[in-house]
Amino acid sequence: MAMAEMATKSSLSAKLTLPSSSTKKTLSLRQVSVSLPTSTSISLLSLFASPPHEAKAAVSIPKDQIVSSLTEVEKTINQVQETGSSVFDATQRVFQVVGDALKPALDTALPIAKQAGEEAMKLASPAFSEASKKAQEAMQSSGFDSEPVFNAAKTVTDVAQQTSKAIEDAKPIASSTMDTISSADPSVIVVAAGAAFLAYLLLPPVFSAISFNFRGYKGDLTPAQTLDLLCTKNYLMVDIRSEKDKEKAGIPRLPSNAKNRVISIPLEELPNKVKGIVRNSKRVEAEIAALKISYLKKINKGSNIIILDSYTDSAKIVAKTLKVLGYKNCYIVTDGFSGGRGWLQSRLGTDSYNFSFAQVLSPSRIIPAASRSFGTRSGTKFLPSSD
């Protein structure tokens, strides 16, 4: 009932906005507009605010919705971090975005979540123990055993705060804490989700490591980020689009030093006879592509792999499958090549695709790069006004 009331009230506001300039702290930073859909905040808060007898209801939220919520919050965190804010300032600003939109619903339906959230935000300050105690008491008063949640979140934060390499040292512990999210026990899932939300409030950068366990792969990279990593870091990009799609839309335009870091492994359509006996042919095709990638000589389990497809649907499956196979540094290009925020719309430039010069993993063999490598014809495609 409380969740239904929240959903009804949340539909009245479309977007979250930061407080007016009169209530903002004066920051010598470039201001950035940060917003989150109300449904995003509800999905996250409902997971950790539900008492035990409502655990099943909380877990009934579709996993895709949870993943979408985590992605949106992560984007907001990244926006805040771009301004150069301190951890505490960033926490305040991001939490303000979440709290403002939920205020009407929280005041009536989830007062415990509101109290716990406000106290959790204070954990970034020196008064850690007192704030932790108050938040724990607020949650326990609703009948929800919050101790496992706070212990998990505190583990992440304590380790992060004990070293100058805060984020890097906290990531493996954050991931370890969240491994239990795959458990079938609803109460365990609620506790793990609560730890994720509190860790996000306490130390926003660690949230990326935690959300990895929900998402199933490392993260999304914008076309600009992808280009930068291919040019300056040891990253590889695997283009899983079909030959037909590449002929039609083109391939990413890359500097010469980055072209040898791109491999084409087209998704292969299953024979009609096989399609008729499998439940999800698209998933099978993507999983086969992931298996091929795992056998590439130039890729190992420590490799940084970026998956590119047309609209990311298959790329997500490939990245998740690779993670299951032990390849944990797998990313996808946001909106793929042809999506609204994809490579084509990024104005980074595209080249015409010439199949005869493509490095391709065929059904039975890998065509040597020495004889076939990514190349272009003389024409170069750009969006209008991209000069």
From Swiss-Prot:
One Pfam family of this chain: Rhodanese
SS bonds (residue pairs): none
Membrane topology: Single-pass membrane protein
Induction cue: By Ca(2+) (at protein level).
Null mutant phenotype: Reduced growth.
Gene: CAS
Post-translational modification (record): Phosphorylation seems to be light-dependent.
UniProt note on tissues of expression: Predominantly expressed in the shoot, including guard cells.
Rhodanese domain boundaries: 231-352
Signal peptide feature range: none
Official protein name in the record: Calcium sensing receptor, chloroplastic
